[in-house]
Amino acid sequence: MFTVEYSEGGRTTIRSERSYVTLEFLLQPIYFPKNGQTVYYEALSSVISDSGEHLNSEAFFETINDEFIKTVLLLQMEHFSQSNSISQDILLNVNLSSLKDDDFIESIIKRNKSNKYHIEVNEIDTPVRDVKILKNIKRLQKSGIYIILDDYYHENEIAHLSLGVIDWDYIKIDKSFLLYNSGNDDCLKALIFVISPYCKNGLIIEGVETYFQNEFVKKYNLLAQGYYYSRPKNIFKEN
């Protein structure tokens, strides 16, 4: 079990019997490059040290269990629901295995009365044909929640196995694609041709960090995310 403490500036401290961690909840926009509009936000968590420094959040989240991840997701829903300034929907990160938990699914649906939140699966850590997971995904989608595959790249065999099994609403293309293929229209066209049939609403390409990459991506009907548009921000500090 975890206890939660709130502090000024949008920071949240989560405690267990033996340890605690302070998180700052951030939002990073997802754009439609053709018109420059923000379509969604992705919710991210930054780990804060006792001295107030930002630590390596990616390394931290690789060491924690599903219960903590589920707690963070529900806290993010509560946190961002306090703001009236966010008109776009928000994507929340979770492991696929967390979607086995019926009580967790029920909590998400109950908290999503505004139909503002969607689920981004950032790690496939359990068999994709798990009957309970597939049932719960359909339940979430029936309630209006999108299910998004994160960090797709051609060498991710587990992600490949999910295509055609999980009915993805969006697929996010890992930032490594742009790193090695910026300007290669044939490569991007081939990717779109192969992957698009496996998602209902389209692709989101990550890692847009330069003007050149943005100009390359905006020729296509893709959503995009990256530091070129914005770094993750604390919207409560911004306002």
Describe these PLM feature segments.
Residues 48-74, 96-146, 155-156, 175-195, ...:
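EAL-type cyclic di-GMP phosphodiesterase domain
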Residues 82-89, 111-116, 143-145, 167, ...:
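Short glycine/proline-enriched coil/turn segments at helix->beta-strand junctions
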Residues 90-94, 119, 171:
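Buried hydrophobic side chains on well-structured beta-strands
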